[in-house]
């Protein structure tokens, strides 16, 4: 139970955050919590910052510094940009690639990140559409970038989103770089004070999907050994189209998909959890596999960086 003095202090902090919030939706959400005097919920949202680690950021979509929202993402982008500029030095502008999946606000967060990086003088590549996480990792190497950001919460529940950071070579972030970026984020000013310049995908970013498929084709073309019937679900995520293209290029033409789970849907309406490792998540896939007498059944997670076979 907060004291009256603690409540007054918390209310002041919340109002300061609202004044700095670039998103009218989360600002109004916090105003409503103030009006309702929901101090427990506000204390939860304003106790510390959303923790940044080797997996980047991940949390529930909501207003406040301990949740995933535009204000938090803009400050995270500023911290990452400052880290990259320090790491690369003064000889050239760092390169940053940004990708996103089909979750709620993923494209918004990606565009905010690209805008912060561009305003800071980075050479910025924004991928043009929702794509799998492995495409982003590939793009970091393909475009010879110094870092990458993938906006995704992988197989988390639909109310979550996240922010994965990759370094040069397309490798996911490891220590001690995570602590250095975390410190840079903590030192960043409020979102309103961080410059942003809108950016649109250029031709090299647009061509990345094709380059990724070309690399897969070169690596796996001709690996099909006779007919193989495949059942596939992308689990409402972003892997469906590109995996289908890759399978066909590799010579696997007899592919059957779970129709109701093929198109990206940020609410994952047909599963209780979009994690293919969870019991029950693959029921529709296994039924399809039995119906078509498939030789193998493949379930992707929503950002298509893992699968169950």
Predicted features, each with a name:
Residues 57-59, 64, 103, 131-132, ...:
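Short, glycine-/Ser/Thr-/acidic-enriched flexible segments
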Residues 21, 25-29, 33-34, 138-146, ...:
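N-terminal glycine-rich phosphate/adenylate-binding segment common to multiple enzyme folds
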Residues 2-113, 203-228, 238:
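An N-terminal, well-structured beta->alpha segment
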Residues 17-21, 25, 41-46, 50, ...:
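Gly/Ser/Thr-enriched, mixed-charge loops and adjacent short helices
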Residues 97-160, 251-309:
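N-terminal small/polar loop signature for handling phosphorylated ligands or for N-terminal nucleophile
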């Amino acid at each position: 139970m907060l004291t009256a003095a603690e409540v007054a202090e918390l209310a002041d902090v919340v109002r300061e955050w609202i004044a700095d919030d670039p998103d009218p939706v989360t600002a109004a959400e916090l105003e409503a919590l103030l009006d309702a005097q929901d101090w427990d919920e506000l204390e939860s949202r304003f106790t510390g910052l959303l923790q940044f680690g080797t997996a980047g950021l991940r949390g529930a979509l909501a207003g406040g510094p301990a949740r995933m929202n535009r204000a938090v993402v803009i400050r995270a982008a500023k911290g990452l940009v400052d880290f990259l500029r320090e790491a690369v030095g003064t000889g050239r502008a760092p390169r940053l690639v940004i990708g996103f999946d089909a979750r709620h606000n993923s494209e918004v967060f990606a565009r905010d990140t690209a805008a912060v990086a561009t305003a800071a003088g980075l050479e910025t590549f924004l991928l043009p559409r929702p794509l799998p996480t492995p495409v982003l990792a590939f793009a970091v190497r393909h475009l010879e970038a110094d870092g990458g950001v993938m906006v995704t919460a992988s197989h988390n529940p639909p109310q979550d989103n996240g922010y994965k950071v990759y370094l040069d070579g397309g490798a996911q972030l490891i220590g001690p770089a995570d602590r250095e970026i975390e410190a840079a984020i903590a030192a960043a000013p409020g979102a309103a004070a961080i410059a942003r310049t809108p950016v649109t995908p250029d031709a090299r970013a647009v061509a990345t999907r094709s380059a990724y498929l070309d690399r897969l084709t070169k690596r796996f073309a001709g690996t099909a050994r006779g007919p193989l019937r495949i059942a596939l679900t992308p689990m409402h995520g972003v892997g469906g189209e590109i995996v289908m293209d890759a399978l066909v290029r590799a010579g696997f033409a007899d592919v059957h998909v779970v129709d109701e789970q093929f198109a990206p849907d940020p609410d994952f309406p047909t599963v209780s959890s979009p994690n293919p490792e969870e019991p029950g998540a693959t029921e529709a896939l296994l039924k399809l596999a039995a119906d078509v007498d498939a030789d193998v059944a493949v379930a992707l997670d929503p950002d298509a960086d893992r699968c169950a076979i």
